[in-house]
Amino acid sequence: MALLDFFLSRKKSTANIAKERLQIIVAERRRSDAEPHYLPQLRKDILEVICKYVQIDPEMVTVQLEQKDGDISILELNVTLPEAEESK
C-alpha cells in the first residue's frame, strides 16, 4: 500500500510550502524578540544590590531571560566576582 500511496499522493503546492516556512520564521522571531521591557531595570537593581557588598564592574553582570515551551521562563544571572584580596 505504501507504494500505491506514493504514486497517488498529491504534492503540496509551493504556496503552502512557503506559508509553512513563513510561519516557522515568524514563530522563531517572536521567541527571540520576546525580551521583557523590565529586564534592563532588573539588571540595574541586581547590580545595585551586589555593589552594596562587593566592588564590581557593571560589565561583569549579565542577566538573560530564556523562554522554553511558551510557559517556562529561565532567568540566568552570571556575576564574575573579583578575586579576594589577601590580608596583610
UniProtKB/Swiss-Prot annotation:
InterPro entries: MinE (IPR005527), MinE_sf (IPR036707). Disulfide bonds: none annotated. One of its GO terms (cellular component) is plasma membrane. The keyword Cell division applies. Keywords: Cell cycle, Cell division. Belongs to the MinE family. This is Cell division topological specificity factor. It comes from Salmonella typhimurium (strain LT2 / SGSC1412 / ATCC 700720). The gene is minE.
